[in-house]
């Protein structure tokens, strides 16, 4: 029989994070969490102040196992392998929001709660352009990729044309 290492979650009396990526609550129940639209595992419970809130399994595991050298700077927990279901401590690290966004599986996609779909967007010259709403991350990501590819081809052709105009004249 193998034993699972558990560590208390700081600030959450009676809560323990486990090496297998799960959490144990004060009633000794093992909590894996249910998946949100992006695959992150979450659960709903009372916080230490007695208010109900949505809690993220990966944050509990990171608080217990992954030292945060700069808590005021590194405010987000990143899944190194980009798999939001892999909440094992060796797959988690504390990052800034900007660094965490760089490691996203699906860039240029975000979940829109109001429309219950993924919003596809690109930023061009500092301006954000909405490309539409999609039911899956894959579809959203493909649209963003195609748009960027067309934009890259357009810019490439502009550069070539400008070069030819300068060398022909």
Cite the ranges covered by each PLM segment.
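C-terminal secondary-structure termini that scaffold catalytic or DNA-interacting sites
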Residues: 166-167
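Conserved recognition-core residues within compact binding domains
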Residues: 1-76, 83-151, 155-163
């Amino acid at each position: 029989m193998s034993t699972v290492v558990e560590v208390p979650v700081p600030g959450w009396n009676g809560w323990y994070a486990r090496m297998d990526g799960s959490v144990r609550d004060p009633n000794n129940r093992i909590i894996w969490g249910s998946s949100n639209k992006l695959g992150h595992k979450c659960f709903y419970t009372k916080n230490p102040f007695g208010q109900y809130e949505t809690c993220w399994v990966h944050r509990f595991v990171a608080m217990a196992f992954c030292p945060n050298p700069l808590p005021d700077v590194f405010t987000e927990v990143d899944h190194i392998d980009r798999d939001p279901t892999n909440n094992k401590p060796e797959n988690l690290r504390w990052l800034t929001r900007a660094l965490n966004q760089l490691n996203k599986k699906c860039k240029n996609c975000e979940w829109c709660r109001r429309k219950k779909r993924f919003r596809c967007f690109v930023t061009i010259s500092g301006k954000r352009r909405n490309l539409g709403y999609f039911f899956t991350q894959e579809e959203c990501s493909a649209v963003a990729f195609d748009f960027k590819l067309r934009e890259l081809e357009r810019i490439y052709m502009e550069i070539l044309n400008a070069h030819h105009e300068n060398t022909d004249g």
